[in-house]
Structures are given as C-alpha cells and as structure tokens.
Amino acid sequence: MFTRVANFCRKVLSREESEAEQAVARPQVTVIPREQHAISRKDISENALKVMYRLNKAGYEAWLVGGGVRDLLLGKKPKDFDVTTNATPEQVRKLFRNCRLVGRRFRLAHVMFGPEIIEVATFRGHHEGNVSDRTTSQRGQNGMLLRDNIFGSIEEDAQRRDFTINSLYYSVADFTVRDYVGGMKDLKDGVIRLIGNPETRYREDPVRMLRAVRFAAKLGMRISPETAEPIPRLATLLNDIPPARLFEESLKLLQAGYGYETYKLLCEYHLFQPLFPTITRYFTENGDSPMERIIEQVLKNTDTRIHNDMRVNPAFLFAAMFWYPLLETAQKIAQESGLTYHDAFALAMNDVLDEACRSLAIPKRLTTLTRDIWQLQLRMSRRQGKRAWKLLEHPKFRAAYDLLALRAEVERNAELQRLVKWWGEFQVSAPPDQKGMLNELDEEPSPRRRTRRPRKRAPRREGTA
C-alpha cells in the first residue's frame, strides 16, 4: 500500500516538474502585424498560397517559414517557398493528389505544381528520449540525429529550427509574422545565430556549420561569436556526412553567386578541408600558389556569370580547382613508374577524381566532363594539320579554352598567353584565315627532338589486373 502511494506521489511530482519546465521553456512570441512588415501576398508563389489556403480550409494551421520569409523581409526574391503545418505528412497527402512523401530522416510532403515543388513539413517536437520514440527519433553515438520525426507545436518547431533568422512564420490567415526566437532583431542586426546550444546543434547535424557560413556569405551577415566558436574544432564531424549530401551542399556553397566569399569563410573556419582534402594539401602559407589563385579566380568568374544570368557547370569548376593537384600527381606517377607523361596523366586523373569522390560523391556525368576538359589541355598546343579543326569541333572545346585562359592568367606564363591568343583568334576567324594561321604554324621551325632513353618497365599498380 505504501509503495503504491509513493509511486502515485512520484508521478504527480514529476508531472508538475515537467509542466513547470515546459512553462519556463515555452518561448515568448512576438506578433508583427501586417503594417509593420514588408511581406505582401503578391510576392509569394501562387502555389504556396494555394497550399496554405487549402490547409487552413481543412482546419489545419499553415505558415510560410524559413528562407522564403527571411528573403521577403529583406526585400529579396525567394528561391523557393516552404510551408509548415500541424497536419501530419499523411494528412497532407490526403488533401493534395499532386503530393508525394519523401525522406526517412525528415518525413516531408512535396506538393508538386509542374516544375515548382512546395515543401510541406509538420511541426517538429522536442526529443524526450522515450523508448517509444525510437521508431521516430534516433541519434548516433556522436550525437547526430539519424531520424527526426517527432511532431509537436509551432512553439516547439521554432526551437527546433537551425538559425533565428530562419525561424520566422508568416500566416495568410491574418497576414502576421510570428517570432519566437528573436529572429527579427537578428535580421535587422545582420547576425547569423544558432538556436539552442551550438555544439549540441552542430553534433545533431554537422551540415549546419556549412549553412552558417553560406548564409553569412550570401546575406552579407556576420556569425555571432557563440555560433562561430565551436566550428573549427567540430569541422571534422563533416566526415560523418554521406558524400552525396556533401556534394549537393558544395554546389550550394560554391555555385550560388557568392562562391568566393563562401570559400574564404570555409577556409577561415577549417571547413574546406573535409570537403576538398586533395586541394588543401597543396595550400601554401602565403596563399599565392597557382592553384590557390586559380580557385579564387574561377569562383569570382562563376559568381559574375550567375549574377549575369549565365549558365555555369560544376564540371568546369572542378576541372579548374583540381588541375594543379592533377599535375603534381601525374608528375609523381611518371617519375616513379617510368610511364610516358600521357599515360601517367591518365592514371592521375583516376587517382585525383577517386579521392575527390570519397569526400563528395561527384556524379559520373560530371567527372566524365571534367576528364574531357583536362585531356583537351594536353591537345591545345598540338595545332598542326587538321588537329586544330578537330579540336574546335569538340563539344567541350569552349570549356577547355576557358581553363587554358585561366591557367595563363594565374601562371603569368608568356607561352600559355600566346597559345590563348592564338586559339582566341582562330575560333572566330573565317576558314581562309584559319588556313593561313595553320600555314604559319607549319613554317615555324619545329623544336629539336631530344633522344629519349629507353623507358623503364612500369611496376604493377595495386588493384589492377
């Protein structure tokens, strides 16, 4: 009898403590009325509005959230619009025939309107660590969230988001913006601030470190000291992230129009090494090697092209970034094996790309294009006969020419600069003039051929048959 009374009292006390903790943890909400913010429905995607109106009509809450709200408040055009609701993914799917559920780690509903996808997420809740939660919530030994499908309230959802500036909620029901974490103030002050304990949040998802840097570069903001402090010592946690996810993140970092500024921040916070270990081995103390100069220049050029609404290709970016590690590797293989430089170059391409893909799962369609651009570099100097015309017809000639021009610029090499000038004139000349340019090449004295020593037999490489 005494035991039963004691258990009853223990349950009552624990319930009261839990309710008290929740009351303390419950954030104070700031409601910003329509006349005090700049968001207008005319700036929101019609499809996002349709999704929110239908959810509201069905009796659910629906809020615009995340980067879309942030960008609208900053007067920028959002790239996409995300919606959050108290409806579960299955309930969302019942409301929209054009909906599919995606994700195991984070269960989401994608409502598709042709090429536009409106992402709908259910309010996330806190992790209590109950046994019954293991099917919906799971952590790795290092604290990383392997599964996060515990649903909760909008107040809990605000606390579960990454940065304060991304935790602002806009309602089409009353046109207000709700702020539970001080996001409006940080937005005005230009501060990137993580919600909650930074080290815990980074361990939950190490990609948040990359996102902090990306937002700082993209928005021209500064990272708050408490948010920045753990990043350098936790940077190696990125090694636990699947390479496919890191590849997608690398494109967001370097091909979104702010690649050069992002690159500088990645290096400052020691985040570049987990993404590109092959490249960081060749960094110099003064940062003025040809490799470092070509990375800076290709990122600046990429940013300019994006801001001018011109196309960019990751294959060209990777071809430029990995060019000098490729040359070093090819030279080393040639010296150690006695292979011709052409054969050593081919093996070096495999080695460099294999190592790159261990960190970033670069798709084969891109590595194939990167190889083409590299191989054409060896052919650009051989222009006699029909070679120049054949090279001009290659689908990757223009990309190869652009890399040649970049090399000439960063190496300050007079011979490369003359070659760039020749190809620049040749590709825009009329056929008769092109023939004249080739005839002039034939009249130039050919370099004296050196007598070659007999080639050593190449040792058998590991892993080859």
Swiss-Prot record:
Coiled-coil region(s): none
Active site positions, chain numbering: 80, 82, 162
EC number from the UniProt entry: 2.7.7.19
Region called Disordered, residue ranges: 429-465
Pro-peptide positions on chain: 1-10
Record field: compositional bias (Basic residues): 448-459
CDD domains tied to this protein: NT_ClassII-CCAase
NCBIfam families: pcnB, PRK11623.1
Protein name: Poly(A) polymerase I
Species of provenance: Escherichia coli (strain K12)
Lineage, opening ranks: Bacteria, Pseudomonadati, Pseudomonadota, Gammaproteobacteria, Enterobacterales
Gene name for this UniProt entry: pcnB
